Design a protein with these regions (language model features):
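Nucleotide-state-sensitive switch-loop elements of NTP-binding domains
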Residues: 2-12, 16, 20-118
Length: 119
């Protein structure tokens, strides 16, 4: 069985602050798991990532410019190319999330956290 890879999925409207939040997270040394990271960028906003400011190395940034690129074969190839142990996805808010779930390799896991019960 292939190694299970956690996926951090960020979904929201265009210009809702996803890129800024992810950039700030990547600048935090506490987010360094020791694993290589595949950062999938599925939309172009006003801000761009600055990998020189990331707190750790081993980050492979890949652009997904069209949802037709969301295939199990393409995502598996990106996983192998990057050698990643985790995936961060800035998802396009205009695309259906189900299309991403249908395309994700079986070993990619998206843990779901709800803030409904947080105080």
């Amino acid at each position: 069985m292939a190694k299970q890879i956690p996926v951090y999925l960020f979904v929201g409207q265009l210009e809702s602050g996803k890129t800024k939040f992810i950039q700030e997270t990547m600048e935090d040394p506490n987010f360094d798991s020791g694993d290589k990271t595949l950062l999938l960028v599925c939309e172009e906003g006003e801000l761009e990532y600055d990998p020189s400011r990331f707190a750790f190395g081993g980050v492979h940034v890949a652009q997904i410019e069209d949802k037709s690129e969301l295939t199990p074969e393409n995502l598996t190839a990106l996983e192998k190319k990057s050698g990643c142990g985790r995936v961060i996805i800035e998802y396009n808010g205009m695309w259906l999330v189900q299309e991403l779930y249908d395309a994700m390799p079986d070993n990619w896991l998206v843990p779901v956290k709800s803030s409904m019960n947080f105080s």
